[in-house]
């Protein structure tokens, strides 16, 4: 695994915090409930006596980040930044693989499509309280999807399917997928986004 990308601003922020701690203290980056929909990433102080033999050390300009053995694969492609805005500054930690372990490029098509749905598409739909589930991939190359949450019964579901999800899947899996189809029995209700 490559080193977690920590921006210069975030490194400076960590250095300021670490300067107020006991000498030899570094940071720990971790995932609670990795590989589940409830996965949460975090950063904490890591005093010298808290380093485990199985930890991976990632060295930066003025400190190290330690990652435990279980969290490590779920932090692949993670990025940490320190963003300053009008209302203040905040640390952002993006870990696209925290909820689902990255699949190999040569994994079966079903697994690769499921990975994209869980790490790229569902996080976008979650803003509207929605999600999709991959039911199957047909022999003729169609991803059969079921919409849930705020997407179920939403009047914009056809646009979301064709202009959003299908376009994204076809661009990522050219020649492997022919399209996406919805098998949801839509029932409009208060849960529907539009």
UniProtKB/Swiss-Prot annotation:
The keyword Ligase does not apply. InterPro entries: Fe/S_biogenesis_protein_NfuA, FeS_biogenesis, FSCA_dom_sf, HesB-like_dom_sf, NIF_FeS_clus_asmbl_NifU_C. Binds 1 [4Fe-4S] cluster per subunit. The cluster is presumably bound at the interface of two monomers. Gene3D superfamilies: Fe-S cluster assembly (FSCA) (3.30.300.130), HesB-like domain (2.60.300.12). Involved in iron-sulfur cluster biogenesis. Binds a 4Fe-4S cluster, can transfer this cluster to apoproteins, and thereby intervenes in the maturation of Fe/S proteins. Could also act as a scaffold/chaperone for damaged Fe/S proteins. Belongs to the NfuA family. HAMAP family: Fe_S_biogen_NfuA. This is Fe/S biogenesis protein NfuA. It comes from Pasteurella multocida (strain Pm70).
